[in-house]
Amino acid sequence: MSVEPVVVIDGKGHLVGRLASVVAKQLLNGQKIVVVRAEELNISGEFFRNKLKYHDFLRKATAFNKTRGPFHFRAPSRIFYKALRGMVSHKTARGKAALERLKVFEGIPPPYDKKKRVVVPQALRVLRLKPGRKYTTLGKLSTSVGWKYEDVVAKLEAKRKVSSAEYYAKKRAFTKKVASANATAAESDVAKQLAALGY
């Protein structure tokens, strides 16, 4: 298997556990991975049931000193990270090195907004869940248990989408111009003479 310098995965529409298992395996193989738009990750099952599960997790704490953990992270990026950490032997040197190859973000911060993003088909909700099954968005769950930055991320994402659309429109116009210029050059008399001479 060839290792890319960095693979950027767009988390939107992926199931948390399935994506985590694929990413964990690649990290252990030496691949650097960045997961963006963690707030758009999905969990199967209705919102209320997943919220109850998270509240059950909130009750788990050290009896005599709560600061000793377990720590209940609310941000979508940290919830995904914790799910993935359980799939890696994170207390060994190999596991620690693997987790250092991972970055998880809400939204798509620079410089990853300019990088090519990929999806993982075996973790996509539309391919894995039966149509009509209920699912929860990680951002919604996080907000319901105390994550405060959903509005901030949404605002930044809206700005990014506008600039991305502008860039794409410019790129498409430029490609069209290049194609028409090439077509014109191919039809010119000089091009025909060169073609006759075998060039």
From Swiss-Prot:
Family per similarity comment: Belongs to the universal ribosomal protein uL13 family.
GO biological process, alphabetically ordered: cytoplasmic translation; maturation of LSU-rRNA; negative regulation of translation
Originating species: Saccharomyces cerevisiae (strain ATCC 204508 / S288c) (Baker's yeast)
Entry keyword set: Acetylation, Cytoplasm, Isopeptide bond, Ribonucleoprotein, Ribosomal protein, Ubl conjugation
Oligomeric and partner information: Component of the large ribosomal subunit (LSU). Mature yeast ribosomes consist of a small (40S) and a large (60S) subunit. The 40S small subunit contains 1 molecule of ribosomal RNA (18S rRNA) and 33 different proteins (encoded by 57 genes). The large 60S subunit contains 3 rRNA molecules (25S, 5.8S and 5S rRNA) and 46 different proteins (encoded by 81 genes).
Gene3D superfamilies in the cross-refs: 1.20.5.4280, Ribosomal protein L13
Main location: cytoplasm
Modified residues (N-acetylserine): 2
Other comments on record: Present with 43300 molecules/cell in log phase SD medium. There are 2 genes for uL13 in yeast.
Subcellular location: Cytoplasm
GO cellular component: cytosol; cytosolic large ribosomal subunit; nucleolus; ribosome
Protein name: Large ribosomal subunit protein uL13A
PTM annotation, UniProt: N-terminally acetylated by acetyltransferase NatA.
GO terms, molecular function: mRNA binding; RNA binding; structural constituent of ribosome
Keyword Thylakoid: no
